[in-house]
Design a protein with these regions (language model features):
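Conserved beta-strand hairpin/beta-sheet module of binuclear metal-dependent hydrolase folds
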Residues: 1-42, 128-149
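Structured catalytic core of nucleotide-sugar glycosyltransferases
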Residues: 4-14, 56-61, 116-118
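Beta-strand->loop->alpha-helix junctions that form or flank phosphate-binding loops
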Residues: 7, 51, 100-104
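Short secondary-structure boundary/capping segments
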Residues: 7, 16, 43, 66, ...
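A generic "binding-loop/recognition-motif" signal
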Residues: 11, 31, 58, 82, ...
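Active-site metal-binding motif and surrounding structural segment of the metallo-beta-lactamase
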Residues: 32-78
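Conserved Rossmann-like nucleotide-binding pocket used by diverse enzymes
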Residues: 53, 117, 146
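Metallo-beta-lactamase
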Residues: 80-141
Length: 151
């Protein structure tokens, strides 16, 4: 399992987490170009990404979603409240139908060889969540959590 922050802070957030077979992003709060550059440093590109999990709708977590959804068609997972919030951000432009996958806190999602578990957090947003990423492998279970913007 590999975890790599591409950006973190009030100017934008994006974290890569992956295994040999499965590659996901948590948030896309920077430009598509910056995400691609960050992935390139790890020998990856947006073509390798299987899914994007969004913690909440604030622009420092969603800035790249519009362009990525139109150019790359990567499935985006988040809660209903977060998706509704994202759809209200006009600067993201048109997001294609079928890109969003609604999830519920405390209900696991399987992507490739991993399980992603969303859980509720406290933040001033619509239905914000954090995520635990779990991989079962020959040498046991590996876990990592992505928790941003608490309070």
């Amino acid at each position: 399992m590999r975890m790599m922050p591409i950006a973190s802070g009030s100017s934008g957030n994006c974290i890569y987490l992956g295994t040999e077979d499965t590659h996901v992003l948590f948030d896309a709060g920077i430009s598509r170009k910056r995400i691609e550059e960050g992935l390139n440093t790890a020998g990856l590109s947006l073509k390798d990404i299987d899914a994007i999990f969004v913690t909440h709708e604030h622009i420092d977590h969603t800035k790249g979603i519009g362009v990525i959804s139109r150019k790359d068609g990567i499935p985006i997972y988040s809660t209903s409240g977060t998706i509704e919030g994202i759809e209200q951000i006009s600067s993201l432009g048109n997001i294609p139908d079928g890109i969003f996958n609604k999830i519920n806190a405390d209900e696991d999602i399987s992507i490739g060889d991993v399980t992603v578990h969303p859980f509720r957090i406290s933040h001033d947003a619509n239905e914000p969540v954090a995520y635990t990423f779990t991989q079962k492998c020959a040498d046991g279970i590996k876990k990592a959590s992505v928790v941003t913007d608490l309070g």
